[in-house]
Amino acid sequence: MSLNSLDLPGKPEDTRVVVAMSGGVDSSVVAGILKREGYDVVGVTLQLYDHGAAVHRAGSCCAGQDIEDARRVSESLGIPHYVLDYEARFREAVIDPFANSYVSGETPIPCVSCNQTVKFADLLQTARDLGADALATGHYIRSRANGAHRALYRPVDTDRDQSYFLFATTQEQIDYLRFPLGHLPKAQVREIAEELGLTVAKKQDSQDICFVPQGKYSDIISRLKPEAANPGDIVHIDGRTLGRHDGIVHYTVGQRRGIGVATGEALYVVHLDAANARVIVGPREALETHKVFLRDVNWLGDTPIADLPKSGMEVFAKVRSTRPPRPAVLRHADGQTWVELVDGESGIAPGQACVLYSDDSNAARVFGGGFIGRSEREPQAEEMLRRLMANADKASAA
């Protein structure tokens, strides 16, 4: 049997596709394209949160005006549209873990958690319950057949590449998902929106952290976890106490501006000692990292990760969404998975993702990745930090 444009057997009119509609231009264009091609399209929007500042600010997602925009687009396309109340689930699976992670001194990525749980687990099951053959989204990433399964690849428009936030997508989910925008540049997507007469054609893109009003994540964390605003010491990696801070929630590893101390030297946040409410600072070279140990690894390569050779596997690693993939070696032994960064990286923090690719091109395959549990710096900085933390532990035990 021949395959349709979604690589599914059967004619488009016999193929039901649920489209995850956020109310933005990308997911609206996905619904419009599929409807134009003759598919049986059903729009679904998740109501994830509903607090005043986010509902009314421009660029939010999955609340207030966005839900209304998705409804209007669906009506103009002539497709059924459903709104599902996932507020409690979103808080449980995304917002609370986000706050907990920050309190523990990590730098979390809530978009990954949202994709991993709410969007690609709960919503996917809803799509199946609706009898859909596939769930389509407006993410900028590509998938195509790879033997009996499908594999993920970076999109044509690398400026919009969302593969970093999708590394935790499981093989089962990948096989069911479709990403119709992966082969299109953003400018063309907006042109298609104009052609389709969509009311959201000129709507601005949503923010990375959709549930944080005005981008001030410290406000929501302080409200959910007041201890994150507890004051503490700002300590140099060499052991000197330089000043005080008003909560580790206001700091992140790699930060230079707004540290709150003036010593005449360029200082960066190199570690957040959450247990002792300390912000550890030091020179830029103390941030240099060459090895990261991963947890919650989602491996999408063809060879089982446990079967990697002792010499490791040459890959390209991305440790921040805004940075390009860089040469690295992936290793796995004794139940541990780690990545050795050939050129080193600065500002790596626990809680961030390390995403793995076949190369650094826009056609690179996504091999999955994991969350950074810990990292190793240059030997001198690593020893100084180890000594500083050990002294704090002794003081706490005394």
Swiss-Prot record:
BP term (GO), one: tRNA wobble position uridine thiolation
Name of the top EC class for this enzyme: transferase
Site entry: Interaction with tRNA: H139, Q352
Positions annotated to bind ATP: A20, M21, S22, G23, G24, V25, D26, S27, L46, G138
Region (Interaction with tRNA): 160-162
Active site: C114, C210
One cellular-component annotation, GO: cytoplasm
InterPro entries named in the record: MnmA-like (IPR004506), MnmA-like_C (IPR046885), MnmA-like_central (IPR046884), MnmA-like_central_sf (IPR023382), Rossmann-like_a/b/a_fold (IPR014729)
Catalytic activity, as annotated: S-sulfanyl-L-cysteinyl-[protein] + uridine(34) in tRNA + AH2 + ATP = 2-thiouridine(34) in tRNA + L-cysteinyl-[protein] + A + AMP + diphosphate + H(+)
Protein name in UniProt: tRNA-specific 2-thiouridylase MnmA
Organism: Brucella abortus (strain 2308)
